[in-house]
Every structure is written in C-alpha cells, then in structure tokens.
Amino acid sequence: MKKALLFRLAVLVAAMMCALGAAAAEAYACYTPSNTTLTFYYDIQRSSRTGTTYDLNTGYADIGWQTDGTNASVTKVVFDPSFAGARPTTTSGWFYDMRNLESITGMSYLNTSEVTDMSYMFAGCEKLTSVDVSHFNTSKVIYMGRMFDLCTRLTSLDLSSFNTSHVAEMRSMFSNCSNLRTIYVGSGWSTAAVMYSTEMFWNCICLVGGQGTTWNSSNPTDKTYAHIDGGTSNPGYFTDKNASLRGDVNGDGSVNISDVTALIDYLLSGRW
C-alpha cells in the first residue's frame, strides 16, 4: 500500500513538472502604479504580476500603455533579465510620448535581432538624458522614422552597433533633438537603402560632426549629412566611434603629427 502511494505521488510530481515545463514563456510588459515603472518580462508568471500587464508585438497603433494613457505616467522603464530570451519583431512606439520618463535600465536584455520597425521608439522622451542603444542589432530594421524625435535632453547617442543596410525610412529620425551634440556611428552605418529622410536633422542646433562640422539651418536636413564627418571636403554630422581615440583630432584612427595640424586649423577657423 505504501509503495503504491509513493508511486502515485511520484507520478503526480512528474506530471506537474512536465506541465510546468510545457508552459510557454511569453513576452509582456507590466506597469506598477506605486513606483510608476514599466517592466518588460519574458516568463510564465504574467498572471501573478501585480499591476497592469500588456501584450507586445502589437504594432504601434495598438500598444496598450499608449491607448490607455499610461505612457504619460511612466518615469522608469526596466528590462528584467528574463527578457533576454524574448525576440520582439517590433519596438515601434514603445516609449513614445513618455514625457516623464527619466531612465531605462537593463537595455542589454533587449535583443533586437528580429526587429524590423523602430519608428517612434523614443520619440517625445523629453526628460530622458541618456539611452544606451550601443548593443542594438539592427540588421533587419526597415523603419527608423522619428526614432529619437523630440528627445530634447539627449546630448549624445552611440549608434556604433547599428547596421542600417536595410533601412528605408529615416524621416525626422533626430529632429528636435535640440541639445544633441554628438552621434557616434560605426562601419555598419549606411544610407544606401534610405528612400525617405526629410527633416532628419531638423532643429538639431547643437550637433557637431567628428571633424567640427556644425549644424546649420542652411544645410540640407535630409540624409545628405548623415555620414561620418570628413571635414570641409565631405562634411557630415556624425563621429566615427572607432576614431574617438584621445588626441585623434582628425578622426583617422591614430594619433600623430597630422592631428596637431588639424587642431591648429580648427583653432584658427574660429569654429570653437
């Protein structure tokens, strides 16, 4: 009798373990009003979370925290370590118009390898002073329109990991980033596929390229200047991340006598 009970108990435990293992993890976000935090998870614990939970991969027009107005209350966004297992296909509008958002932590847990749309992702984040997108995999992204529009407190962006070979739309990507001074890019940056880029740098009044090219309202605001600054011969608004070596004034990736010459020319030009 005792052996039979133990056997049944073992079978029951095994069945429970199988059921638990079979439960599929899901990607979702949970808003907690008590600390005005929106947290992203990828697990099987959604039903036990305290707060309001939202589906992901819904598309920009159907994001739950946008349609119910929660976005205006969020002050902090957190990516839980579990979210590293998620593979979202869109991040469009995720933080759109979060005008009170002050910080985003755990961004390294956001895997963007399957994302095709990043439009409006950070648009309107007026209180955000920094955002770490340096690890983003953008090899499948097609849309980046208004991605950082109206991020008025950002002073620098590191886009050195970006591969933009498939991006077709960059309209107003950095528009109204009125305090943005430096945009770092790497070898993966390209505008070859870009079809739409109007007002890409509209009102980026503080922007300076790696060799001193400054934003000017008389310059084209489309993709024309969306490349690494080559100085007067090929002016651009970006800075080569690989050339940001201390003392590398001319951005050629090394420190030598030519940097002294470039520095003298820069000082004599009066652009400083």
Predicted regions located by residue number:
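Sec-dependent, cleavable N-terminal signal peptides
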Residues: 1-26
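Short, glycine/serine-rich, charged loops/turns that create anion-binding
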Residues: 16, 45, 268
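Negatively charged
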Residues: 23-243
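Alpha-helical segments with a strong preference for the paired helices of cellulosomal dockerin domains
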Residues: 249-272
